[in-house]
Amino acid sequence: MHEFDDDMFDAFISQHDNGNFMQRVAWADVKSEWLPHRFMWSQDGEPVAAVQFLSRKGLWYAPRGPVMDYTNTDLVSDVLRDISLVTRIGGAKYVKMDPPVLIRRKTANDNSLLYGETGLIGQFLREGYEHQGFSKALSSTIQPRYHMVVPLNRTFPDAFPKKTRRLIRDAVRKYVKVDICGVDRLDDFMKVIHATETRQGITLRSEQYFESLFNAFGDDVELYLATIDVNRALIEESVHYDRLIDERIHTGRAPKKYHQLQEQIQSSQSLIDLLGTLSFSNNTVVVCGALVISSNQSKEILYAGMNDEFSKFSGQYLTFATIMNDAKVQGFHELSMGGVDGDLNDSLSRFKSKFDPDVIEYYGEFDKSKNRWWKFVYRQALPMYQNIRHRALALRKTLK
């Protein structure tokens, strides 16, 4: 193994094709309740592999790691063998790795882009690891096996389906504005996060957690907020409405033009009525938001939330489209919209599918336990406890 410091470790992770933000030193700062363990391997004086484990109560977990060239089977074998040794010396009771390797990539409606078997499962098996299978359920693994990603070599918004382009235009027409904000706007982001938690009956993250992401990753974290300045929107739309009325008066007997103006007037009146129903303070409402992180040549939407009260404004479509366009302008190659269920039939998958993404599938998790007792603890007892605790916290939140 190779001697290194944090800067060298991060440089390798950030430059490697298989690097991921969860293998960076900053991720351990976010997960401060876990103890980090980092290892690096070199050949001819140059680093060729690295891994960051986070350990807690005997569990050693490497999210999207180790980072290395998985086509180099000799290197993979050496790294896995060394990991078995260092985790045993470190007192690990249970080791879980989630290698950043795809088993397949396809478009949302096509299975033609497939990766062949790399023999990865066999290599892990030879070192005593068990593959946890190819479950499609989002909740079956710590990190989602399926992600929806959008290649950024496209022209936006032309690359989106027709309906998506219409919804984006609809958001602009309804005075939705998307801005990149700083940590000082986290309280606004939490409003849409809480609205999402209530709507879906889930618990996401606290404001302190999101603040820790900003503190650890700095400029690599961006907060997008979609807002409406309601007073300004009402004033501008009222002016637009009056202009349409005036134009209709002076149209004369041209039936086609008159009919078009009549439809525009009705649409404008409907928008004024809709804006008038909004409850707000300080003139501005937060429609939706998303927290984005940069890693290597890609970006990922880590968390997103929407207030259902403003669902008719299509803000989430404009927000996602803005994130993609910004990422392309900044020179990134790909944007991940985050994890989805593998069957692609849930509401989250259906929403993300409207941006014509590719679906990528990771191999999933490989586990190794010290003995059968610890295998039972980490595979059955601990997940059962966590599920009960999660339900109790959700119930307590509902009763407040």
State where each predicted segment sits:
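A conserved beta-strand-loop-helix scaffold within acyl/acetyltransferase catalytic domains
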Residues: 2-58, 102-107, 117, 127-141, ...
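Catalytic phosphate/metal-binding cores of nucleic-acid and nucleotide-processing enzymes, i.e., regions
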Residues: 61
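Short beta-strand-to-loop capping motifs
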Residues: 64-68, 150-153
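Conserved acetyl-CoA-binding loop-helix of GNAT-fold acetyltransferases
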Residues: 73-85, 312-325
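Conserved GNAT acetyl-CoA-binding A-motif
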Residues: 88-108, 328-339
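Active-site/acyl-donor-binding loops of N-acyltransferases
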Residues: 109-155, 329-400
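Extended hydrophobic/aromatic segments used for targeting, binding, or gating
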Residues: 288-292, 300-301, 327-333, 349
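Short, contiguous acidic/charged loop-to-helix segments that flank catalytic cores in large enzymes
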Residues: 305-314, 339-343
